[in-house]
Structure formats: structure tokens, C-alpha cells
Amino acid sequence: MAHDMYPNSPPRLTPDLLLRGYMAGIFPMAEARDDDAVFWVDPRQRGVLPLDGVHVSRKLRRFLARTEWTLSLNQDFAGVVAGCADRDETWINDQIFDAYTALHAMGFAHALEVREDGALIGGVYGVAIGTAFFGESMFSRRPNGSKVALVALCAHLRRCGYTLFDTQFVTPHLATMGAVEISRDSYRAQLRAALSAKADLTARPLPRTPAQIRAPGPGQPRS
């Protein structure tokens, strides 16, 4: 995917700088875990996941109905970010980890956790401003772990009044869930509208189990 990159210059990432970046339509990344430099990314084609168009396959619906995993919100933000960074190649370096942890303490960054017998086995985290949620990364230590986290998050965002789920890019995994690419101009128009309204991720309780998620399936209304 074509995108423009802007090298970061001092000062280092701060919560305020992150918020201003998101509101301007850009986001930070690092080349690798051990590379302390950060650059800003502005994709020409932006990935979004329409909250009224999330695709949940019949197979995944059956899994949601029978699994005994549990869900939680903001119980282990650092653990979720660490899980997302725990891979051979990652764009999450120490500077990014610290900045998002600080943003979480301010109430702007959030994580949804998936647990099996109390152990963290999947999750997703991102930033919420207005009615926009900027998805940063997700991880899975069990098959379907990240899918369950994503479906749960999308359902929760919609119930809480969010209108824009920014996935930044569209991976094959996200495409199967309904993510699409839109132009930079279209994205920024949607972003402006989302930033002009308000929503609260804690306005509604998060379902405790995947079986309680109101997730649409093929041929079913997305209500």
C-alpha cells in the first residue's frame, strides 16, 4: 500500500503529540523493536472496518457460542501491548510502548482482553477520540484469539455510539472481517465527522463472554 512517511524529530512521543497526530489523520510506527526512531504514517489508501458491516462467519459464530473464554476491558493494557509486540517483526518499540501506556492512563487508549482460565490469550488495543476508534494492533496465543477480540470490540464500539473504526491498513485477516480501503480524502472527511461528536467506551457494559456478543452472521441483520 502506498503511503507517505514523515520522520519524527524531537521531542519524543508524548500523549499530547499522539492525540494531535490522530486528529490530523496520521499515526506513528517504528521500523523495529530495537530501533528507537519513530516515523509518522499517512496512508494514501486508509483501512477502515465499517461497524455496521463486520463479517462474522458461521464457523466463528459457532466458536463464539461454545467457547468458555472470558472478555474484559482495560484490565491489562500493558499486557495486551506487550502481546502485540511479542513477534519476530514488530513496529512497537519502547518509545511507542511508553507513550501509549501514558495515553491509557489519561483515558484515551484502551485494550480489550481475551482470557482462557484467567490467562491472557488474545487482545486488541487502540485509541478513542470522539466517535472514532483507531485500532493499533492485536494478538493471539490461541486460534481465533484475535478474531474474538476484534468481533467483541466492534460490537462494543457500535453499542457505545462509535462511528469510525480506523484499521490503518487492510491485511488479509482484516479483509475477511469486512475491512475496506478508502481514499485519504474520504477518510479525513469521516474523521472530521467522528471528531465532532462524542462517545464513551465505558457507556455500556462489555459482555463477559463471547457467547453474549451480538455479532451479525451471514444473512442476519446487523442489529
Curated annotation (Swiss-Prot):
Under Pfam families, the record lists: Leu_Phe_trans (PF03588)
Tell me the keywords, alphabetical order: Acyltransferase, Cytoplasm, Transferase
Q: List, in alphabetical order, the GO biological process terms annotated in this UniProt record.
A: protein catabolic process
What Enzyme Commission number(s) does the record list for this chain? 2.3.2.6
Question: Where does the protein end up?
Answer: Cytoplasm
SUPFAM superfamilies under this entry?
A: Acyl-CoA N-acyltransferases (Nat)
**Phosphoprotein found in the keyword field:** no
- Statement: the UniProt record of this protein carries the keyword Plastid: no
Main function? Functions in the N-end rule pathway of protein degradation where it conjugates Leu, Phe and, less efficiently, Met from aminoacyl-tRNAs to the N-termini of proteins containing an N-terminal arginine or lysine.
**PANTHER family listed in its UniProt record:** LEUCYL/PHENYLALANYL-TRNA--PROTEIN TRANSFERASE, LEUCYL_PHENYLALANYL-TRNA--PROTEIN TRANSFERASE
Q: What is this protein called?
A: Leucyl/phenylalanyl-tRNA--protein transferase
Q: Which organism is it from?
A: Dinoroseobacter shibae (strain DSM 16493 / NCIMB 14021 / DFL 12)
Its ancestry begins with: Bacteria, Pseudomonadati, Pseudomonadota, Alphaproteobacteria, Rhodobacterales
